[in-house]
Amino acid sequence: MFAQLISTLKKSPKTIVFTEGTDPRILEASARLLSGNFLKPVLVGNPDEIAAAAEDIGFNIRGAEIIDPENYDGMDEMVDKMVELRKGKMTADECRAALKKSNYFGTMLVKMGKADCLLGGATYSTADTVRPALQLIKTKPGNKIVSSWFIMVRPAASGENEVLAMADCAINIKPNEDELVEICKETVSCAKIFGVDPKVAFLSYSTLGSGKGEDVDKMRNACEKAKALMPDTPIGGEFQFDAAVSPAVAKTKHITDAVGGHANTFIFPDINAGNIGYKIAQRLGSFDAYGPILLGLNAPINDLSRGCNAQEVYSMAIITAALA
């Protein structure tokens, strides 16, 4: 998967903002990206501190652009633009103060076209990455929410990687029917970029009416709405997980559609199920988990786990740039 993404990026290199420019993991990943010559890092922070940090750990970041919010020539223009975007919710002084923070500053670099995408969160919380994106990048026309998905990858016996999509595992706590449909639509669209031919299962503790309750109704209704919205995408449910992935179980439960037993894209009923589900696949199923990848924004802004390593930063940078 990554070889194909890199090949595509080499034909049209992108620029990515890293909001934590002195972090050793960011610097190591930036050095690797620069050596590949397909993605240009923009490191936010003090140039002397970034250079010293890179030298201390022995990574060559020559070729990266370093931008310091404290000494940025375009700050007045950026403040004016942010005031306009916030529509009276922040004064110029409040915007200027916010732009001293690398998460807001980096997001505005993307908004103003100085970079194609952003990756943050190595030291920031998810909220501190998502909040500026919601306020400044905003959601796509027609979208009401930001959501997230994970790419799950593991080697298969055939020699090719097995790739699954799981959503929403990180952002929306208890999405309603229409929000689940939006999550499904955005996940399907993005999954195709990464080589997944989506077969979507809306997951539940019930399979086609075997269980009862409001949560079952929610998933069943959302599934029907998604089918109507995307008639060319195989979508099924509500399914229990085993019925979604096991042909034998699907046969036993008399599921006859194209999704039952063969699903590769999973829509969870809430964040509890989604977060637990992807981590079980990661820890017990030997899948590598990449994400959360944010959905529904006007530009690619993604969040790292604070426990990430340099390899995960490198991989997420490629994934983020592929969406630009």
Residue ranges and their predicted role:
Residues 1-260, 265-324:
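Anion-binding alpha/beta catalytic cores of soluble intermediary-metabolism enzymes, centered on
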